[in-house]
Regions:
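Short beta-strand and adjoining strand-loop segment in the mid-core
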Residues: 128-143, 169, 186
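Residues on a specific face of well-ordered alpha-helices
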Residues: 39, 143, 147, 151, ...
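Conserved active-site and cofactor/substrate-binding residues in soluble primary-metabolism enzymes
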Residues: 32, 36, 144, 173, ...
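A conserved active-site-flanking secondary-structure segment within enzyme catalytic domains
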Residues: 135-165
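Conserved anion/nucleotide-ligand pocket segment
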Residues: 161-191
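Extended, subdomain-level signal for the structured scaffold at the beginning of enzyme domains
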Residues: 1-118, 127-130, 159, 183, ...
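Generic secondary-structure signature for well-ordered alpha-helical cores
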Residues: 46, 151-154, 187-191
Length: 191
């Protein structure tokens, strides 16, 4: 069973080959997008009877981050903490750059340089592009944001797919599209 966010075990490094996931939550993130991308990993752990995936919630600052629905989630870690992860999932709002300061962008660059997979759900692709991590890639994001993204980042191709994978970078359209992305990863990693 995965550790609860904020518990001491949630900040420890994985054991027994569990894939460590850092989930970046920025204010007014989509709770549906978060649940859709995260729940398949929880179910995989349960069905396997062991921890295949471990996740920790990270904020621009440690503390409460409120979803667009008003539900607060406590992040035990901030982007200033020393964090390693095999996979980073970026969960943002319909105004993704509003809470993405220099520290967040530097954190994404640092984890990319360390070889982490970078996943952006919903509008998270805006942050990866702003951090300079999407050049030459094809990405997808929430349909309402496709035109604005294409206008701001003309060097990045966009698609209307549920999700796109390009090397260590994956993007998905938000809503329940995260289920498809996560299930594809689980199938590749554990059959």
């Amino acid at each position: 069973m995965p550790a609860r966010a904020g518990s001491p075990a949630a900040t420890a490094e994985p054991t027994g080959g569990a894939i460590d996931i850092a989930v970046l939550l920025l204010p007014r993130f989509s709770l549906m997008a978060l649940a859709s991308v995260l729940e398949p990993f929880r179910v995989a752990n349960r069905l396997a009877g062991r921890e295949l995936y471990r996740w920790r919630f990270v904020g621009a600052e440690a503390g409460r981050v409120q979803a667009s629905s008003g539900l607060p989630i406590t992040t035990g870690l901030s982007v200033r903490d020393p964090i390693t992860a095999r996979r980073v999932i970026v969960c943002t709002s319909f105004e993704p750059m509003a809470a993405a300061g220099r520290a967040v962008l530097a954190w994404l660059r640092r984890l990319d340089a360390a070889g982490a997979e970078l996943w952006a759900v919903d509008t998270g692709a805006f942050l990866l592009a702003e951090a300079g991590l999407l050049a030459g890639r094809t990405v997808t994001l929430h349909w309402e944001s496709l035109a604005a993204f294409a206008e701001l980042h003309d060097g990045v191709a966009t698609s209307r797919s549920l999700f796109e994978r390009s090397g260590r970078v994956a993007t998905c359209a938000g809503g329940t599209a995260g289920i498809d992305l996560a299930l594809t990863a689980i199938a590749a990693e554990h059959g």
